[in-house]
């Protein structure tokens, strides 16, 4: 049965109301109408309230309210990125923050990442800033390379979490399997750090901003080594998701040289059902409010509109595409 054909057609009145609403939003954005002439409810999903995305979502909501008083943004926390993306797919929100690796898994419907079917209604608004994959070992464990992890006691993050899936990809590309390690742990980052402090764990990894507090704290307690993720490893993994990156010298105590690694983008996401004019307005407000976002969290210092398309793993929403064409980011 053709499900699409069997759906009831929209009434002329409903279609007319929708067209009128879109026209009002477009006119308000263009300045042809008072911004109060149309009201738009916009729900922003920010993941866990303790995470980086939550203060940025609050700041973006405030910026939307200021620049477009007709918008009625609300910020909602979720259990994490996966839940946020599922909510978007179902049309229960308009905007969400995500990491590029999780977004790629959602788009593909990767079952071992917790997605039973592809979330094919998702669309990108733009790449915000990178998370760096940071592999660290206790200096006295004698580990200097990924190969040196063989036979060691390693924590790879919570099973099936984003970082654990990153660990699988990176270690596999380096010729390592979990069976290669002397002992494997599936622990949250905080617990892994505490075990390393107590010399009960040799190494761990995290996907985080540079200078993440947990690693700074670890480096003040024990001597650490930041393990390189070399270019040949990057070439063997999904280069649509992972980007070449560098952890600059002196990011952590005792780290005297730049260390190559890979990074994944933080991405602002919407879904195909959100009107083009709404997404255009959100995209414009996002990139003209970097100062306000930086005030909410220093991660926004790395935001650069000229890099908004780097590392995107799903299609752009047409409303975002329009903004990038107008500003010359997209030719």
Stretch-by-stretch model annotation:
Residues 6-27:
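N-terminal secretory signal peptides and thylakoid transit peptides that target proteins
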Residues 114-128, 133, 251-260:
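A structural signal for short loop-to-beta-strand junctions that line the ligand-binding cleft
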Residues 100, 111, 141, 177-269, ...:
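Pocket-lining segment of extracytoplasmic ligand-binding domains
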Residues 42-67, 71-72, 131-198, 310, ...:
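Bilobed "Venus flytrap"/periplasmic-binding protein-like clamshell domains
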Residues 152-169, 241-312:
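Ligand-binding clefts/hinges and TM-proximal coupling segments of bilobed small-molecule sensing domains
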Residues 55-59, 65-88, 254-256:
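Extracytoplasmic small-molecule ligand-binding "clamshell" domains
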Residues 187-191, 197-199, 208-226, 232, ...:
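An extracytoplasmic/periplasmic, membrane-proximal ligand-sensing/linker region
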Residues 33-39:
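Sec/Tat signal peptide C-region and signal peptidase I cleavage site
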